[in-house]
A protein has these predicted regions:
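Basic amphipathic alpha-helical segments that dock to polyanions
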Residues: 68-78
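DNA-recognition alpha helix
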Residues: 43, 48-61
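Intrinsically disordered, low-complexity serine/threonine- and proline-rich regulatory segments
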Residues: 1-41
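Non-DNA-binding regulatory cores of transcription-related proteins
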Residues: 78-145
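Amphipathic alpha-helical interaction segments
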Residues: 34-37, 51, 67-70
Length: 145
């Protein structure tokens, strides 16, 4: 089981989406609120922009795919999401911003959290001069047997 995301308080109640956005320095616009509710009011999850766009459209909200992409990147810059690049051009956004890794279920592309302390990464190369390693993402690919 992975660590709780910072969006969840100790007593398992949720911070309201409006409060979460304000604390991150973002104005709670209609679009941000609609997308934020889907992302943050519930269990931690992994979504693509296309999946989130389909979900918000299914609720009758009119939010363009470009706005979904822009909002996800705003949430990421504000520290509310992590972005995971899988399969080159496919990006997932993770509401659990704690230090953890992932299982990738092939072929459907579903991501599942691995607890932060379940994998130990050793023997990393020295980064080039003037650079530092900020994060290592491990994706363990799974297939049904």
């Amino acid at each position: 089981m992975s660590e709780k995301s910072p969006h969840h308080m100790e007593d398992a109640t949720l911070v309201t989406t409006s409060d979460l956005l304000r604390k991150a320095g973002l104005r709670p616009t209609r679009q941000r609120m609609a997308l934020g509710r889907l992302l943050f009011e519930g269990a931690d999850r992994h979504v693509t922009a296309e999946q989130l766009h389909a979900e918000v459209a299914g609720l009758g909200e009119h939010v363009s795919l470009a706005t979904v992409y822009n909002t996800l990147h705003q949430f990421k810059r504000a520290g509310l999401l992590r972005e995971l690049a899988i399969e080159g051009s496919k990006a997932y956004f993770d509401t659990n911003t704690s230090n953890h890794n992932h299982f990738l279920l092939e072929p459907n592309g579903e991501l599942m959290d691995i607890a932060g302390d379940a994998i130990s990464v050793e023997g990393l190369p020295e980064p080039p001069e003037g650079m530092k390693i900020t994060h290592v993402d491990v994706v363990v690919r799974l297939a049904k047997i």
